[in-house]
Amino acid sequence: DEKSAGGISVPGPMGPSGPRGLPGPPGAPGPQGFQGPPGEPGEPGASGPMGPRGPPGPPGKNGDDGEAGKPGRPGERGPPGPQGARGLPGTAGLPGMKGHRGFSGLDGAKGDAGPAGPKGEPGSPGENGAPGQMGPRGLPGERGRPGASGPAGARGNDGATGAAGPPGPTGPAGPPGFPGAVGAKGEAGPQGARGSEGPQGVRGEPGPPGPAGAAGPAGNPGADGQPGAKGANGAPGIAGAPGFPGARGPSGPQGPSGAPGPKGNSGEPGAPGNKGDTGAKGEPGPTGIQGPPGPAGEEGKRGARGEPGPTGLPGPPGERGGPGSRGFPGADGIAGPKGPAGERGSPGPAGPKGSPGEAGRPGEAGLPGAKGLTGSPGSPGPDGKTGPPGPAGQDGRPGPAGPPGARGQAGVMGFPGPKGAAGEPGKAGERGVPGPPGAVGPAGKDGEAGAQGPPGPAGPAGERGEQGPAGPGFQGLPGPAGPPGEAGKPGEQGVPGDLGAPGPSGARGERGFPGERGVQGPPGPAGPRGNGAPGNDGAKGDAGAPGAPGSQGAPGLQGMPGERGAAGLPGPKGDRGDAGPKGADGAPGKDGVRGLTGPIGPPGPAGATGDKGEAGPSGPAGPTGARGAPGDRGEPGPPGPAGFAGPPGADGQPGAKGEPGDAGAKGDAGPSGPAGPTGPPGPIGNVGAPGPKGARGSAGPPGATGFPGAAGRVGPPGPSGNAGPPGPPGPVGKEGGKGPRGETGPAGRPGEVGPPGPPGPSGEKGSPGADGPAGAPGTPGPQGIGQRGVVGLPGQRGERGFPGLPGPSGEPGKQGPSGSSGERGPPGPMGPPGLAGPPGEAGREGSPGAEGSPGRDGSPGPKGDRGETGPGPPGAPGAPGAPGPVGPAGKSGDRGETGPSGPAGPAGPAGARGPAGPQGPRGDKGETGEQGDRGIKGHRGFSGLQGPAGPPGSPGEQGPSGASGPAGPRGPPGSAGTPGKDGLNGLPGPIGPPGPRGRTGDAGPVGPPGPPGPPGPPGPP
């Protein structure tokens, strides 16, 4: 079973070995036996029962060489045994204790060679003897020592990015924002003449929403416009739908108050006018100060549980390997396709209230005008065209305060949404280019090799215990797959133990659940403005009954300039702005967590011929044969049986530490989806400060090297194939006869370096790294040349905007320190069995077998010709040769996932406040005029040129996290971090097939003469 860790499959510990399976079928017959001794002369007698082993005879005199005996024919093949019944699936056992190191088999004592006996007459050919009994399987020889460590391999190419995860669930709505301040009532202006209704304007396209600006200083109040003359009553208009509030234009300079016009006659009440079209798109406001970071989102739901994979055959537990050296930094990975956008989160909490703007300077008081007669209020007429601003009027007395303006609708600022659900696991990346072989690790001690039991169903994973010794027994058939257990916590790092015998590779399991949510990183820069549209205006009420026409009043006095009106409703959200410029390069992040060890690659090329092996133990005593006369040295016997496979090579050292990956921008909380293509951000500025490099992925243990045939140089790791179940054990060969001792052959030279293996699949991505340090503050932008824009008509005050888009990112931060090595990861999957190595050098001859009983005396035969001296039978398989030269360094591992982005850089400097416009004289307050209908929205004013940059503003509260920006270019390589802890030993691979038959050993030295045989019976007359 696997637990999720940030979307990374972490293999759980292997289940314990199941019970011993039933014995398999008998093996195939062994190779041809050695040449038998010459038969005794004379008619063969009936085979007598096997007698007890007799004492060795006294040494005899040197006899003449006898004729070479004919080789005996091979024994007949025994019938195959019945197939054993399939073993029942074993129940999961407790984790076994670590097994003791097995003792090497002792060499059998070599018998003393007896002196050669007198040369007897050549014997007649003997009958073919019955096939000898199958001897017990010899003990494995002492394991060869692994070679010295080679340089670390270079990093392999990065795998393709996985598919994006599904969007997370929508979070709960946040609390409502702060209510807007009540606007001061404007002074009543003089009643203007009603203008004729203008044509309905064309509805403008909604503009993209500008980022919410921080509360800026209050501008100087503009001058009131000159009241227009009252127009004639228009015909009742058709009731229109409520219009959208137009964007607020820049405040124009205050013009002088115009003289009050004469009050017009009250017009007939007009019908409600048509709703005005949407106003032109407003210019985006300045970037707002970042709000405080939102609370951490809820933890994402646990992903769907993967289907349990078939239970692999458990291999014997291996001993822990020695520590590996740190791998080289990895190269940058290619950004994957952009994942689908997650569901929109709830609005974040309301940002802090902006500081109040500076109060406008009061204008000089004008002379009070004469009070005019109050006219009857007329019915509201249709909207008049907006006239140009009139000349500045004289300042009058301030009028009475008007009623408070209607409170604008506050936009709801919600909290950040909960963490989205974990995405589906991405597809495995493309297979990378094969890396050169890794360095050979230190030799592990021999473990006790046992036969494997059938796999039991997977039980619940416990704490990882010490490796237990391999259980004996033949390999049973695999049991049905049990339900996957919960993954246990990784065990503490233990002292590297002895290397055990390799086990078969298990099938690769399904991808596990996503991991637990990581620690909340520092808040990122403010995100783009939400796309919640403001509410529409309410429907216009029905027109009231027309009032009685009033009498013509005297012209009123010129009114005072009105106060600023209440804030208007916000306009609809505009289209998304163009993409901002590419952000500055991010600073390199910390080292990623040590990645999981990739699967073991295919076996490397066959190693060079190994050194001559030690002599094997003495075989059991064969049946006592009839003793013949000593013959001449026989012809070379047939090749001996193939030796056992050599011990597994030492585990390779982990690769060197990877290069620091690029810092990724901070994404929303939750498991990182694959990096999307650099989409056009909103009206986003430079990319936020680069985030820290992800922590180094947890290092997996080095995979166990498959058994080499003879120890050659270590081949490169290749991709992991799904290991099939091991085949049934082959039949034990019949024991051949013992040949004469061969001479010690020369030691083989080290093998040539084999070509690198095919690339392995990319490993799982590491967990997101810890946050890096904040970037340095950004440099102020160039000073713009301000040019006063055309004054637009004042619009209604907009509502408080949403938090602004993040400001430009600061300069890239300096490279962070190397991260400490990650915790040891679980063992990687086992690789396929290694290929058989090349034949080893001829081994030293084994110890002589037990002495047979003395044979019956044969009659002396005629003296034969001296046989030719030939090579003796092959010796026992040689021990593994010395390790070959270390291969070139492999490429470094895959780059870890992009870590969360670092904190946002400090806010850029605020722009300088523009110069205040000239204050016009205050006009006389006129009579309160009738309330006119809503005017047609004016044209959008031209945006002014950028003003000079102001001094840096104080950093605002941190805003909610923004969307992840595109990944910056790759930072410089970080310095090598400290080596991580040793990875756990990988499971040993299955034993490879036996290597080819060893070379026939050179002829051994002629042994001393054997003891003389007793005189034979007299020959026939």
Swiss-Prot record:
InterPro entries: Collagen, Collagen_superfamily. It holds the Pfam family Collagen. These protein fragments were extracted from an ancient scute bone collected in Buenos Aires in Argentina. It comes from Doedicurus sp. Residues 318-327 have a biased composition (Gly residues). The modification 5-hydroxylysine is found at K98, K263, K338, K582, K693, K863, K925, K937. Residues 62-76, 922-936 have a biased composition (Basic and acidic residues). Glycans are attached at K98, K937. The lineage of its organism: Eukaryota, Metazoa, Chordata, Craniata, Vertebrata. It is found in: Secreted; Secreted, Extracellular space; Secreted, Extracellular space, Extracellular matrix. Contains mostly 4-hydroxyproline. Proline residues at the third position of the tripeptide repeating unit (G-X-Y) are hydroxylated in some or all of the chains. Residues 31-50, 112-128, 146-164, 212-262, 371-425, 484-493, 536-558, 615-629, 642-672, 698-714, 743-752, 762-777, 838-853, 907-921, 955-988 have a biased composition (Low complexity). Expressed in bones. Residues 1-1021 are annotated as: Disordered. This is Collagen alpha-1(I) chain.
